[in-house]
Amino acid sequence: MKVGVIGAGVMGRGIAQVSAMAGHSVILFDINHEMIEVAQKAIDSNLKKAIDLKKITTEEKDATQERIQFSNSIADVNVDLVIEAIVEKIDVKLKVFNELAEINKENTIYASNTSSIPLTQIAAGFKYPQKMIGIHFFNPAHIMKLVEVIRAEQTSAEVLDIATNYVSSIQKRCIIAADSPGFIVNRVARHFYVEGLKILEEDVASNETIDELIRSAGFKMGPFELMDLIGVETNLSVTESMYELFNYDQKFRPNRIQQKKVQAGYFGRKSGQGFYTYDK
């Protein structure tokens, strides 16, 4: 299968890497040339780490990289499966999807990696609604085993089968989720972040203490470490979307501390500053 990944950010390049490692031909597209360069270096670094951990051989690394084509031209994205991993704005996603629909063949499938936008709503604005589906990876995509597959009201049974087979082919655990706000994982996880922010806001504990306690309870990361990894602005966008989709239920209300971080440009690891400070 030839896979086209739209967006060379952290999520997009992870999806491209894991697809290529599974033997799929991949084209990774981004309009930003610098993002392409960063993605190339990040994938190379990830694969070198995998060699050091004896998970792959040098030959497998080389073969994986040979399967990935990088491009700044959307006209190059002529594939069997499109996976979009761009900004969480439906108008931007639909513009890209409908542009790709003019380039690709009739049997191409279109998937969104959206964290919270209803797939039925995306499909409704797309030229081929029956070919739209959600394939939601978790960060970092080349490591995290779980993938949610979300069927829109319009998605055909054939497209659902192809999507689930693709997820299985890249050695991920596939969970079929209903098209509801936040799907399964993000709906449950929202309280992980929201309550952590409330505790910080009420001066019950510092973000360092909260993260340390959560790790001590068996979690790999605390809420603030995880927000910095995902992107504070990305996490806030999901919370805002779910708050609106759940008719402004207060349990999903965005927190002012997080909003101020975003306003200041403190996005986490990617910017060098979030709830913690990082070397860029």
Residue ranges and their predicted role:
Residues E34-S45, V92, E158-S169, T209-E212, ...:
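A non-catalytic, amphipathic alpha-helix used as a structural packing/dimerization or gating element
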Residues N46, K145-L146, F192-G196, G222, ...:
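A general alpha-helix detector
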Residues A22-I27, S168-D179, E201-E202, N207-K280:
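NAD(P)-dependent Rossmann-like dehydrogenase/reductase catalytic/cofactor-binding core
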Residues V38, K49-I109, I117:
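Rossmann-like NAD(P)-binding element
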Residues I109-D179, F183-R187:
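Rossmann-fold dinucleotide-binding core
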Residues M1-K49, L53:
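NAD(P)+-binding Rossmann beta1-loop-alpha1 motif at the extreme N-terminus of oxidoreductases
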